[in-house]
Amino acid sequence: MNGIITPQKQKQLMSSPSRDPLSTTELSTPTSQTTVDVNDTKKSEGLDSTIILLTPGTSPNATPGSSELGLSKKPNSIKNNTYSTAAQAAYLNRRAADQSTVMTTDPISYANNNINNGTLPQQNAYYANSYYPSYYAQSQAISNNRPGVSGFRPAFNSVAPCYGSQWQTHQSVHPYHVNNTHQYLKPYVQNVYPQMPSLNQPGLHIVNQPTYLAPVPSATVPTNSVSLSMPSFSQGQKNIPAAINQEMSVGTTKENTNYLSQLVGLHPAIPPAIPSMFPMSHDNKKSNMESTSRTRNVYIRGLPPNTSDENLLLYTNRFGKVSSSKAIIDMETNLCKGYGFACFEEEKSALICISAMTLCGYQCSFAKESFSARLQSLQDTESTNLYISNLPLHWNESDISTLFKPSKIISNRVLRDSKEQSRGVGFARMQDRKTAEDIINKFNNFVLDPALPPLQIRFADSTDQKKFKGQTQKRRLWRAREYSVLTKGMTANNAFSKVEEFANNSMPSKVGMYVPLESNTVYQHSPTYDTYGWQSMYPSYSVYPSNYENSRSTTPYHAHPATSAAN
């Protein structure tokens, strides 16, 4: 019975207040009307005093085509329909002028709250041209939006829209941080240099050379630094294995090899050596461990071209206190010639350096007698023949005799070229050794003409000295040519320009860059090795593993001491 509409109920419904289904405005009666007078100022714009009748229930949310769109007019307004249309146009113009060109609110919320369902036409929600949604946002069309343009609705309600340059500051487009704090992206290795640590930073093992302290990365970045208790050099290196600490001989046990491998793997890891075409044999390696003159100076051959004095100090000061070190640099190319020297304060530190560097493929030995000292030891102590250089080009034999008077000269000669032009060089044989020594003391560095260099007088080379000079010169030329061939691919593309200075750039050199540390190794290829194709020079087993039993047998110059002894 409740659903049956009786004439009485219908009468009550007609007399009760009615409600627009899409509006909150109540209508007192279906026929109630409100008059709105147009301002008299509009008359100057060509408008009459037309009265526009609007239904109070009309709302911007009324659907198109509803009965609320009808405008009730007074009888005299029917003939003034054109003026009513003009009034609507004026209203729209005022509304468009008040509309802000650039929205200050969220365009998504504006579009959701201002859908075009109103009675009067409205502008569509304005989307700034520089608005970019997040890359993970899902494109969803907003109903009755701008024709042909679909809106964007982020998948997460908490995401705020971005404008212009603000898009790049949004967290979703940030690059991945090495600490793995981003929740959407997968990690990747970032090609950066670690920060230079402070001098007193805890956890640093190499502290005996604070001036050239190597940078270490943060604990969150895996590197090739090895967690190893470095021996305290100030305490006499108590952690050195007995075979090295007591016998001072080549490490031939597994304990010694592992210990040396750990020293090699400390940051900065010592790079693989430039190989030699004619490496030393195992017998020569043993002889290189013997210091006949009890010297502490170590000769190291096989250094990469980018090795500087600072790099060499960083490589050698892990074995003990270094009193001096020098990498031999070519003055023309500013690159290392492939060898250098390191002088230690203690002989046992030099022994450890030779053993460890040999493990990396370097040719190391106690520095032999210098070239000048060796040459002097080969001279003839009974010779009276003098070698004279920087002679004036117009001088002849009589001029030399006149210069050395009253000393007696047995014979003299000025060297000339094929055109009989003087070379500025001559010889003079004196009467005895004492007279020759007096001539050297008196006329060596003697200035004949301020426009010419001073005279240089010394004893002429003996037969043994000439032979030694020839051998040394050939050896140096061969090694220089060999080293140039082996490093040609590295220097051709300027791969080894001048190494960055640690103090100026606060970053490690190319050799000291970081590479990920694998689980079962204590020594990794340096980035220099991987970048410049040194794999063609070394076999795959030239990386020295900590599990020594599983290492493969090697050729002599790659051999571990223990492997060579076993064979």
Curated annotation (Swiss-Prot):
Record's compositionally biased regions (Polar residues): 1-18, 56-66
Cellular compartments per GO CC: cytoplasm; cytosol; nucleus; ribonucleoprotein complex
Biased composition annotated in UniProt, kind: Low complexity: 21-35
Residue span(s) of domain RRM: 296-380, 384-462
Alphabetical list of CDD domains matching this protein: RRM1_MSSP, RRM2_MSSP
Pfam families on file: RRM_1 (PF00076)
Record keywords, A-Z: Cytoplasm, Meiosis, Repeat, RNA-binding, Sporulation
Cellular localization per UniProt: Cytoplasm
Any one Gene Ontology molecular-function term assigned to this protein's record: poly(A) binding
Main location: cytoplasm
Protein name per Swiss-Prot or TrEMBL: Sporulation-specific protein 5
Gene: spo5
